[in-house]
UniProtKB/Swiss-Prot annotation:
PANTHER family the record matches: RIBOSOME MATURATION FACTOR RIMP
Pfam family, one: DUF150_C
GO cellular component terms given for this protein: cytosol
Species, as recorded: Vibrio atlanticus (strain LGP32) (Vibrio splendidus (strain Mel32))
The UniProt record lists the keyword Lipid biosynthesis: no
Keyword terms: Cytoplasm, Ribosome biogenesis
This protein's name: Ribosome maturation factor RimP
Gene: rimP
Keyword Transmembrane included in the entry's annotation: no
Family per similarity comment: Belongs to the RimP family.
Biological role: Required for maturation of 30S ribosomal subunits.
């Protein structure tokens, strides 16, 4: 998570929670004039288009006042979906036993991309069973992690 993403998460967590939703996480993708702020929300009852619209309006109001992003961007609000992104230690705990795809910031054993089943989370270290071998990844070294849906 970048400094900006951390700042945005802190800024938006309370307004999203006040609306009755969990701020699962967010991503800011820089692409010049086509940058995107993608916000993932969830609730015990799931998420529909009206929920996304409500949160989008609330987030827009906060962003207009705080103005933390200096470039033009598109705001996207969505559910985490089947390939749910994992941002926090609690997310890994919630999905122990599920298959995950992990991309690291810095390679471990000459690899940046890993797939396996989440075994446990201890502090800031997640243990993943990869091809019969348990691997450990520090959360701060994980660039991106998503659940792999089972059909």
């Amino acid at each position: 998570m970048t400094g900006l993403e951390r700042q945005l998460t802190e800024m938006l967590d309370a307004p999203v929670a006040a609306s009755g939703y969990e701020l699962v996480g967010l991503e800011f993708i820089r692409a010049g004039e086509h940058s995107t702020l993608r916000i993932y929300i969830d609730s015990p009852n799931g998420i529909n288009v009206d929920d996304c619209s409500e949160v989008s309006h609330q987030v827009s109001a906060v962003m207009d006042v705080e103005d933390p992003i200096s470039v033009a961007y598109n705001l996207e609000v969505s559910s985490p979906g089947l390939e749910r992104p994992l941002f926090k230690a609690e997310h890994y705990q919630q999905f122990i036993g599920h298959e995950v795809s992990i991309v690291l910031k810095m390679a471990v054993g000459n690899r940046r991309k890993w797939k396996g089943d989440i075994q446990s989370i201890e502090g800031e270290t997640v243990k993943v069973l990869v091809e019969g071998q348990e691997e450990e990844f520090v959360l701060s070294n994980i660039a991106k992690a998503n659940l792999i849906p089972k059909f």
